[in-house]
Amino acid sequence: MHVTLVEINVHDDKVEQFIDVFRQNHLGSIKEPGNLRFDVLQDPQVLTRFYIYEAYVDEQAVAFHKTTPHYKTCVEQLEPLMTGPRTKKVFMGLMP
């Protein structure tokens, strides 16, 4: 299992817009073959910080995800909302 944890920080006045933009990516991603989880999390201490927990069966499923229209649209629309670049950590899922 291929797991990615993405951190995204957005401007104070862009939180609702981020949620709207990311909802479309979430809804498309959970329908992809090979997707096991796609959780969108908000930091309760820092409401402008979000984490995306993505679990796919393998790297090929991740590669496919990055070709989808919902992913490409989300990445494009996120750019002006973020305070800086997204950060990612990749893990091997052992015990889901």
UniProtKB/Swiss-Prot annotation:
Keywords: Cytoplasm, Isomerase. InterPro entries: ABM_dom (IPR007138), AI-2_Isomerase_LsrG (IPR050744), Dimeric_a/b-barrel (IPR011008), LsrG (IPR033672). Homodimer. This is (4S)-4-hydroxy-5-phosphonooxypentane-2,3-dione isomerase. Gene3D superfamilies: 3.30.70.100. It catalyses: (2S)-2-hydroxy-3,4-dioxopentyl phosphate = 3-hydroxy-2,4-dioxopentyl phosphate. Its main location: cytoplasm. One of its GO terms (molecular function) is oxidoreductase activity. It comes from Salmonella typhimurium (strain LT2 / SGSC1412 / ATCC 700720). It comes from the Bacteria. One of its GO terms (cellular component) is cytosol. The gene is lsrG. Its EC number is 5.3.1.32. NCBIfam families: PRK10486.1. It is found in: Cytoplasm.
